[in-house]
A protein has these predicted regions:
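Activation segment
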Residues: 20, 62, 116, 159-160
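Allosteric regulatory "coupling" segments in signal-transduction proteins
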Residues: 72, 123-128, 167-171
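Short loop/turn elements that form and flank the Walker-type P-loop nucleotide-binding site
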Residues: 2-5, 100-102, 121
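Catalytic strand-loop-helix junctions within cyclic-nucleotide turnover domains
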Residues: 61-71, 105-125, 141-145
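Alpha-helical scaffold within the catalytic cores of cyclic-nucleotide enzymes
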Residues: 33-48, 64-105, 130-143
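Cytosolic regulatory/linker segments at or just downstream of nucleotide-handling modules
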Residues: 112-114, 135, 141-180
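Acidic/histidine metal-binding catalytic segments
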Residues: 54-55, 94-106, 148-155
């Protein structure tokens, strides 16, 4: 493994468990696949890497393992692309008479430990560390704040481009010693 700097993002479909419980299995899997495909494309378009899909959540990273000087900007652009992709997916779902999806995206920049993780029999490229945990916690805050994209102060301070953002007061998140 190696220590690298990058921007980690998590996106999670909101209220997906009730959807799965009340939807035929084929439709639930098809909907999730359509969502993941659209989000994967948006992340890749902005030079990101999708690390894993877990349940209704997707984990991505920008700047790792391939260095990107503007990884924070790329992550915010990817999140905006994900917003547009979800809007288009929901337009298609509406035409088909299906309910709309909503999601939250958390973004955090910092150092990660990157490398192959797992067992002797099965491993995958993974990121470990506080940056990953905080990005996940920030995604969780999107529900509380009623927003679809939320970036940490560390990410915002690294931005080189201009983005319209609303500032939120710092908040404590589980597993992190200071407010973000």
């Amino acid at each position: 493994g190696e220590r690298l700097e990058g921007t980690v993002m998590f996106a999670d479909l909101r209220d997906f468990t009730p959807f799965v419980e009340t939807t035929p299995p084929e439709e639930a899997i098809s909907g999730m696949r359509a969502y993941f495909t659209a989000m994967h494309r948006a992340i890749r378009l902005h030079r990101g890497l999708v690390l894993q899909f877990v349940g209704a959540e997707i984990e991505g990273v920008l700047g790792v393992p391939v260095h990107l000087k503007d990884h924070s900007d790329a992550a915010v652009r990817a999140a905006l692309g994900m917003r547009r992709a979800l809007k288009e997916l929901n337009r298609q779902r509406s035409i088909q008479g299906k309910s709309a999806f909503a999601h939250g995206i958390g973004i955090h920049s910092g150092n990660v430990l990157a490398g192959n993780s797992g067992s002797d029999e099965q491993s995958a490229y993974a990121l470990i560390g506080n940056t990953v945990n905080v990005a996940s916690r920030i995604q969780g805050l999107t529900k509380e704040l009623g927003c679809d994209i939320l970036a940490s102060q560390e990410t915002v301070e690294q931005l080189q481009g201009s983005f319209r953002m609303d500032k939120e007061p710092p908040r404590l998140v589980k597993g992190y010693s200071r407010p973000i």
